[in-house]
Amino acid sequence: MTPTSSPTPSTKRQLTVPTVADLAAEGKAPEILFWVGCAGAFDDRYKRVTRAFARILEHVGTNYAVLGLEESCTGDPAKRAGNEFLFQMQAMQNITTMNGYGIKKIVTACPHCFNTIKNEYPALGGDYEVIHHSTYLQQLINEGKVAVQGGESYKGRRITFHDSCYLGRANNIYEAPRDVLAALDADLVEMKRSKANGLCCGAGGAQMWKEPEPGKKDINIERTEEALATLSGQAAALDNLRGVETERTAPSQHSLQGSIIAVSCPFCMTMMSDGVKNKEQESAVQVFDLAELIASAEGINA
């Protein structure tokens, strides 16, 4: 398995994703709108997450649809960069489209889209129930609709979870992704800077779209070093990181081979993957989204 590949898939089969327009033409409406997001639609790496989550929705029989070409950027990057006018233009376009279809419930795999639609669209007339896919996956597992068995086994593999800023600090969602990972029966290890004290991947606040300011180290490299040190149990490596207090006695060391950095955000996926490449650990450590891991463990082809 290469680090840029998806987890081991089952037999490949065709995936047909319905659009809201197609259902509307038949006089039907989806129970849930799957908001794909820009990264989920255009970024080659995160398209795999989109497929994995769509496979899961199909697998459990969720009545869902996507907007397809009618979906536009939520306006999050524009707003974070200070262009409120552009944000409101993009937001109103989406709100008009969704209200026209009578959309009530939305699920998305992007914390940036989640935060914007949930917390900022209501002021512009867009009131919806918005769920991040980590919470939805948690619900499916708790309800027994996803058994997390029949596919790839993660038992004993070391996994550390990187908290997304917009999922965690902005919306206080910390346990859902961890509950999802716990279902894999893997060896979950927490980074010192986690949950409310987690370190940003470096891409939020529209930083994804600009060159970094001069400094000693890029944030994603710092965060990746912490993840790798946590996975390998190297206290000495943690000593070199800012804001990380290490234990007095070094924990037992582990091989990085087969270890996983789990994420729940397309920005974090890009930044952590680049960090792993920078540290030349691509052959040992992989970066996966929660949906990819669950689809793989369930034996669903993504």
Predicted regions mapped to residue ranges:
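Iron-sulfur-cluster electron-transfer modules
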Residues: M1-E71, G75-A109, F114-G125, L140
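Iron-sulfur (Fe-S) cluster-binding segments and ferredoxin-like electron-carrier domains
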Residues: E84-L86, K118-N119, N172-I173, P177, ...
